[in-house]
Amino acid sequence: MMKTVFFGTPDFAVPTLEALLGHPDIDVLAVVSQPDRRRGRGSKLIPSPVKEVAVQAGIPVWQPERVKRCQETLAKLKNCQADFFVVVAYGQLLSPEILVMPRLGCVNVHGSLLPKYRGAAPLQWAIANGETETGVTTMLMDEGMDTGAMLLKTTTPIGLMDNLTAIGDRLARSGAELLVQTLKDLDAGQLQPIPQTETEATYAPLLKKGDFVINWHRSALEIHNQVRGFAPACHTAWGEQILKIISTVPLGAEFFPLLPEKYQDLATAYLNYSLEAGEPGNIIGTIKNWGPVLETGNGHLLLEQVQPPGKKPQSGWDFINGNRSTISFA
């Protein structure tokens, strides 16, 4: 029986915890998660998704503000005498004191093909940068930020219309399977850790407010990648208001073969449509049942789904029908 302590916080970490809880050869001794946070109306304290799963399973949950400084939690972790600490999107760095506690090490599930996209937002930046492939890497943790020796990898393609939610869900499931296999192989002495090549490392920093602002002078593909990579947070100025851009479709013969079947009617309509000329950020036409087409710095972009202030998300077609006056986001 492999004794583990699980460190994790968001939805992305839940499938891995569930896989550990459901495995007959793995004993989850405790879960460490970020403290409950106040959210929503009434500012109620909301537990993390990982905590909710652990509580339902009857597993002890520890929630220190700073795990490396909480003597009570450190003592509990040491007393566990675990074989592994498993870390998935926990949200805090582990101290050297913690890293040496488990018998076989601290194993991290990272949402990228290391050494590419080390850091806090690997999925977001992989999509925003237009990568066509990503994946999950398990690694033995060291004191650095995602710099530990690699164990196993699994890959997944990124389609032109895949967004953060779709890729995140896919990697969460594949990462859970990969983690279980990693623990089994490590326990059996069948894995040889592979050091990362520093010269190949790239980074995925925390997102800043400016990352969500759309610059219409960029190309249609760059804006599309930004929107789907940082979904659903990208936005543009709309008069004196802010319009959230939830999803887009890049238009052009080079993109249509890469679009799912449901967009083929859109492709046909676009190729048969006479568009006006315009400056980046101008609406240069409307495709029936789909929505407005915008000029960008290079190419045309359809607004598939948007969210006006104070309203629920709506299709680009509904948005344009409700705002018939001239609209520009320039």
UniProtKB/Swiss-Prot annotation:
Keywords: Protein biosynthesis, Transferase
Record carries keyword Protein biosynthesis: yes
A single MF term (Gene Ontology): methionyl-tRNA formyltransferase activity
Superkingdom in the source lineage: Bacteria
InterPro entries: Fmt, Formyl_trans_C, Formyl_transf_N, Formyl_transf_N_sf, Formyl_transferase-like_C_sf, GART_AS, Met-tRNA-FMT_C, Met-tRNA-FMT_N
GO cellular component: cytoplasm; cytosol
GO biological process: 'de novo' IMP biosynthetic process
Keyword NADP appears in the UniProt entry: no
Catalysis: reaction(s): L-methionyl-tRNA(fMet) + (6R)-10-formyltetrahydrofolate = N-formyl-L-methionyl-tRNA(fMet) + (6S)-5,6,7,8-tetrahydrofolate + H(+)
Binding, (6S)-5,6,7,8-tetrahydrofolate: S112, L113, L114, P115
EC number annotated for this UniProt entry: 2.1.2.9
Record family assignment: Belongs to the Fmt family.
Cross-referenced HAMAP family: Formyl_trans (MF_00182)
Described purpose of this protein according to its UniProt entry: Attaches a formyl group to the free amino group of methionyl-tRNA(fMet). The formyl group appears to play a dual role in the initiator identity of N-formylmethionyl-tRNA by promoting its recognition by IF2 and preventing the misappropriation of this tRNA by the elongation apparatus.
Name of the protein this chain belongs to: Methionyl-tRNA formyltransferase
The organism's taxonomic lineage, starting at the top: Bacteria, Bacillati, Cyanobacteriota, Cyanophyceae, Synechococcales
